[in-house]
Amino acid sequence: MLDPKFLRNELAVTAERLATRGFILDVAHLTQLEEKRKSLQVATEELQAARNAISKSIGQAKARGEDVDAIMAQVGDLGSQVDAKKLELAAVLEEVNAIAMSMPNLPDESAPIGADETQNVEVRRWGTPRSFDFPIKDHIDLGEGLNGLDFKSAVKITGSRFIVMKGQIARLNRALGQFMLDLHTTEHGYTEAYVPLLVNEASLLGTGQLPKFGEDLFHTKPATEEGQGLSLIPTAEVPLTNLVRDSIVDEDELPIKLTAHTACFRSEAGSYGKDTRGLIRQHQFDKVELVQLVKPEDSMAALETLTNHAETVLQRLGLPYRTVVLCTGDMGFGSSKTYDIEVWLPGQNTYREISSCSNMKDFQARRMQARYRVKADNKPALLHTLNGSGLAVGRTLVAILENYQNADGSVTIPEALRSYMGGLTQIG
């Protein structure tokens, strides 16, 4: 949520910056609503003052033995007018709030201006894609050939865009999540958290999934009242970031760095027909999430650090990747600046996103009222929040299967994972 004061005082600037994201702000309508709000506010306060002044005269009139029925009627009439104005004001404020909740974050000045993903800017590459001297397979053929990926059973049990993993591939998938958690907690300074996979509406509003992206979520309909309105998490960013909702942390506690390995659930409502085969776009997938809560002056540096933490996973696994900074038209709703990390997939002969690392600045914190107490003046100030995948486990599995495949259909296990696989060096 944007700063209301900045929005009111810099409406034209806000509209101009939001336009670079493809969001057209109706300045005229918002200005009209603001004028109406001011007018109703003044009218309400004047009526309240008049009612209070007349109310005081009732006691005086009674003391003089005068009839107060007319005065009482006048007070009642003014009270009705106050109530009516309050209702009008509440309706205007509700509309203003709905508009404010629909606005994406303002892009950082360092984010390149562009309309879509074709105008994202590559900032670096790591590793060289492997040259194969045999016909390569994609992860689907490799996984099915190794009896480790069972798409048919998943369709029978649930439906499309789900997977059943078996044997050593299931073990490899588990090893990846454990490896990522160990790296981030022992070397990068994150605290591991175990979090609920079901969250309430307030949590989703806080991190920005609601109200805009409700159709992308899976919502529960329990038989009992307890649990009504819960939704499956689309990312562990939601529960991790909401740990500081409606709270004030001490400045000495910052930065707070959290990580969790969870299943994530997305309906993929807007991606019909995209990546219909394989593990790239699933309704249920595992992800290791990284969240940082920092002071405002530290957030841009924290974004670089967090992105590096995600990149380190790929480097340790020996997987080629590139990092791009997203243009304004391709950034997520709550982000002010985002880096996407894209891993090389030989089966698709291209780089595909495996992590998205974003600085939300105070956008989420304002929604959540997540603050810290500034030591200098002992006053609360909004935190800056950051998040990123460290990494998407399923897509990392895809990258390993395709990059480490052998001519006979077997897959070599990266050295960094062998201790998690009981010393196994190859699957198949």
From Swiss-Prot:
Pathway where this protein functions: Aminoacyl-tRNA biosynthesis; selenocysteinyl-tRNA(Sec) biosynthesis; L-seryl-tRNA(Sec) from L-serine and tRNA(Sec): step 1/1
**UniProt binding sites for ATP:** R266, S267, E268, E353, I354, S355, S356
| Catalytic reactions of this protein | tRNA(Ser) + L-serine + ATP = L-seryl-tRNA(Ser) + AMP + diphosphate + H(+); tRNA(Sec) + L-serine + ATP = L-seryl-tRNA(Sec) + AMP + diphosphate + H(+)
Quote the record's binding site residues for L-serine. Answer: T235, A236, E237, E289, S389
* Broadest EC class assigned to this enzyme: ligase
Q: Where in the cell is it found?
A: Cytoplasm
Q: Please classify the protein's predominant subcellular localization into one broad category.
A: cytoplasm
- Please name the CDD domains in this protein's record: SerRS_core
Single GO BP term: selenocysteine biosynthetic process
Tell me the superkingdom of the source.
Answer: Bacteria
Q: What is its EC number?
A: 6.1.1.11
- Which GO molecular-function terms appear in the entry? ATP binding; serine-tRNA ligase activity
Give the record's keywords alphabetically.
Aminoacyl-tRNA synthetase, ATP-binding, Cytoplasm, Ligase, Nucleotide-binding, Protein biosynthesis
Q: Kindly list the GO CC terms recorded for this protein.
A: cytoplasm
Identify the Pfam families for this entry.
Answer: Seryl_tRNA_N, tRNA-synt_2b
What the record says about family reads:
Belongs to the class-II aminoacyl-tRNA synthetase family. Type-1 seryl-tRNA synthetase subfamily.
Cite the domain annotation text.
Answer: Consists of two distinct domains, a catalytic core and a N-terminal extension that is involved in tRNA binding.
The entry's function note states: Catalyzes the attachment of serine to tRNA(Ser). Is also able to aminoacylate tRNA(Sec) with serine, to form the misacylated tRNA L-seryl-tRNA(Sec), which will be further converted into selenocysteinyl-tRNA(Sec).
Q: How does it assemble?
A: Homodimer. The tRNA molecule binds across the dimer.
* Protein name in UniProt: Serine--tRNA ligase
Its source organism is: Shewanella sp. (strain W3-18-1)
Which lineage do the record's taxonomy fields give for this organism?
A: Bacteria, Pseudomonadati, Pseudomonadota, Gammaproteobacteria, Alteromonadales
Q: Which gene encodes it?
A: serS
